[in-house]
């Protein structure tokens, strides 16, 4: 397990949802949240906070879109009608009305967030009107890749929050 040598215990997953609410409450920017496509509960928490604060949610990343589709079909993920929007529709909303859930929390070069950080994503351009949340911790060996993506996002003027700055991730291990 990736955290077996850490003393103490892991915070509850519910603490992440409370932290999302706290961040969403005070944010008048577009929020981009990067997390693992396999973490259905985390995606549900992001959707819950978006609904609570009247934001639409667009999803970027093939693996995340696939997981959301199957999880919704099986009843494991619930979003009120009209909450999830196609990424092609983000231009009709103001930044403070949007959340984008994306893959790429581990700095993978071809993942959506990495392409956003280098200006190579076809549908999402990062601006100073963005708050980007890494709702993950780097898997050992990925620290440099994640750090590079954070640096690139900050160069574009975005505000970036990650686990050392706020309780936006708890270990599943």
Feature annotation, model-predicted:
Residues 1-173:
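Acidic/His-rich, metal-assisted hydrolase cores and their charged scaffolds
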């Amino acid at each position: 397990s990736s955290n077996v040598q850490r003393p103490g215990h892991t915070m509850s997953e519910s603490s992440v949802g409370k932290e999302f609410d706290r961040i969403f409450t005070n944010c008048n920017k577009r929020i981009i949240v990067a997390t693992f496509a396999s973490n259905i509960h985390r995606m549900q928490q992001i959707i819950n906070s978006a609904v609570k604060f009247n934001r639409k949610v667009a999803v970027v990343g093939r693996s995340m879109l696939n997981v959301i589709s199957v999880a919704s079909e099986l009843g494991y993920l619930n979003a009120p009608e009209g909450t999830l929007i196609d990424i092609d529709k983000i231009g009709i909303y103001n930044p403070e009305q949007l959340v984008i859930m994306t893959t790429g929390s581990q700095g993978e070069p071809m993942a959506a967030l990495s392409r956003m950080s280098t200006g190579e994503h076809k549908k999402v351009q990062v601006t100073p009107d963005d708050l980007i949340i890494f709702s993950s911790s780097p898997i050992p060996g990925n620290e440099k890749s994640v750090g590079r993506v954070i640096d690139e996002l900050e160069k574009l003027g975005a505000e970036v929050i990650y686990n050392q700055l706020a309780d936006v991730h708890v270990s599943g291990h």
